[in-house]
Amino acid sequence: YDSVVVVENLKGGELQATGTGFIFKKSDNKYYVMTNYHVINGASSVKIQLTNNKELNVEVLGGDSYSDIAILAFESKDDYSIAEIGSSTDARVGDTTFAVGAPVDSTTYSWSVTRGIVSGKDRMVKVSTSSQTSSSDYIMKVLQTDAAINSGNSGGPLCNSNGQVIGITNMKLVSNSTSNIEGMGFAIPIEDAIDFANKIINGEDITRPTLGVSMLDISSTGLAYYNISVPDNVTNGVVIMSVSKGSAAEEGGLKKGDVILEIDNVKVTSSALLKYELYRHNIGDEITLKINRNGFEKTLKIKLTK
């Protein structure tokens, strides 16, 4: 509980937004804090507030929108609580969970604890990686919980009944005009977050492979706008709109108008899913694409580049 902090996103000295984070590691006199990237995105400076109400300036070591993880650091000779890391893999559906955070108004409701269960595992949820648009362009594999999660909880720990962190709360589904939704919150599995955090702490570049194409989902209304037709028997996949010169796609033989049906035997249902599968690979890996070109299926091998 005492390892949880309020994260303050400041721009020009003015508070823009608040979220939650937690101290997860200490090395010598350096403490490391984990939070969501979207909590600190756009900040010119970041502060954290501890459970003893002490406020500290922190350094942003790194992060990115696809992992939605950011790592902060500060130096201190004082002793602060460090969260115990658990296992999302060992968590079972129905297990008790606790979310700790600073929902809604961090000045009033900081360090609120809510209780729920693990409602599901390995949920594939579409997300937007840009604050400029709400359209989904990526997919995250997450834990599902019915523990109450509200604005401001983002970046806080989702814990098991032993108080060990099994995930980082990062989003919830909300009601709209067509559906009434309650108790559907999500958390990034702690194993994924720690793996990313260690890369940041070790000074590794966070680079992701690229095909070097622009694309549209087959279901997109944009295909009609660009006067692009696909074979009637092709109902899933993404259409290649353009191929960059010198790109991995061009080297591997992808052409404008090709429809990507599968990547490494995984059926491609959207460009968001294709990107998710692509980013599971490293630069230099070879992938296998099944495509439809002018009504005929074809298999291509492509070596991934930056």
Predicted feature residues:
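C-terminal recognition in membrane/secretory proteostasis and scaffolding
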Residues: 59-60, 73, 160-162, 195-306
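Terminal peptide-recognition signature
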Residues: 5-7, 21, 31-35, 58, ...
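Active-site substrate-binding loop(s) of clan PA
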Residues: 22-23, 59-61, 78-107, 188, ...
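Active-site loop architecture of trypsin-fold serine endopeptidases
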Residues: 13-15, 43-46, 80, 100-115, ...
